[in-house]
Amino acid sequence: QSALEEAFQTSSPRHKRNAVRAVFAFIDGCHNFVRSHVNSQASAYKHLYSLSDLAVLREESPYVDERGNVKTRQLKVPLITSIKALLKLLEKNNVAKHEVDLTHSGFFALAKAIEIRNRVVHPKNAKELDLSENDMQLVAQAFNWYLAFALRISYASNEALETLINSFKK
């Protein structure tokens, strides 16, 4: 969180932009971990999930090439859509209980923070590089919400895997 703290302690536009980039680098990396965690849980409970469900968790899309070979290509799912999909997929397993609230202001802040990140990373003009205090507050709120989300989902999928492992011990 030091990039965020540094951005709030200074009015430097460069520090603010670096903080936005750092937050989303963390979120992107963490989301890959969370998705793979849910994929492990889903793979252990395969009877609850369709092949499409498992493909989405692996971010793969099957296709047939011009020679008739079945192949897969990478599927890029936007972060907000991916979060919703992970929650729906976890809900298929009643053992993997979570308490994630998509009506929480932090989730809405995440959607706004993604717009801010996109504006900073792909500016259409120099003005789009300017970040207000409100922008930084939204990014901080998004970071906090995502961190709580990742911890809750990881815990839920861990619990589901632990329940399955314990069922084999009986």
Give the location of each predicted region.
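Charged alpha-helical initiation segments
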Residues: 1-21, 37-38, 145, 164-167
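Short, solvent-exposed segments of well-ordered alpha helices
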Residues: 9-21, 104-111, 130-133
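Hydrophobic alpha-helical packing segments in soluble, helical-rich domains
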Residues: 22-30
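Long amphipathic alpha-helical segments
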Residues: 40, 130, 151-170
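Flexible secondary-structure boundary motifs
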Residues: 42-119, 123, 127, 145-155
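Short secondary-structure subsegments characteristic of cysteine-rich extracellular domains
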Residues: 134-150
